[in-house]
Swiss-Prot record:
Protein name: Translation initiation factor IF-1
Gene3D superfamilies: Nucleic acid-binding proteins
Main location: cytoplasm
Subcellular location: Cytoplasm
Subunit structure: Component of the 30S ribosomal translation pre-initiation complex which assembles on the 30S ribosome in the order IF-2 and IF-3, IF-1 and N-formylmethionyl-tRNA(fMet); mRNA recruitment can occur at any time during PIC assembly.
GO MF term set: ribosome binding; rRNA binding; translation initiation factor activity
Gene this protein is translated from: infA
Species whose genome carries this gene: Methylococcus capsulatus (strain ATCC 33009 / NCIMB 11132 / Bath)
Annotated function: One of the essential components for the initiation of protein synthesis. Stabilizes the binding of IF-2 and IF-3 on the 30S subunit to which N-formylmethionyl-tRNA(fMet) subsequently binds. Helps modulate mRNA selection, yielding the 30S pre-initiation complex (PIC). Upon addition of the 50S ribosomal subunit IF-1, IF-2 and IF-3 are released leaving the mature 70S translation initiation complex.
Alphabetically ordered keywords of this record: Cytoplasm, Initiation factor, Protein biosynthesis, RNA-binding, rRNA-binding
S1-like domain segment(s): 1-72
Entries under HAMAP family matching the protein: IF_1
Xref: SMART domains: S1 (SM00316)
Length: 72
């Protein structure tokens, strides 16, 4: 699947779950389960509850996402 197939959205981290997984509420109100992308994990980017993040969703499963950017 190419990068163009992903849906990019922004949201807010509302809960931290085990294994670097987070519950994120998107700007449209939907809640998804998101994990950290590999580059963020490699560079030790810390994500806390309340952070604004950019996530990528796949069109096949809109309940799971990947966190690709943490806003300041």
């Amino acid at each position: 699947m190419s990068k163009e197939d992903h849906i990019e959205m922004e949201g807010k981290v509302i809960e931290t779950l085990p294994n670097t997984t987070f519950r994120v509420q998107l700007d449209n109100g939907h809640v998804v389960i998101a994990h950290i992308s590999g580059k963020m994990r490699k560079n030790y980017i810390r994500i806390l509850t309340g952070d604004r993040v950019k996530v990528e969703l796949t069109p096949y499963d809109l309940s799971k996402a990947r966190i690709t950017f943490r806003h300041r």
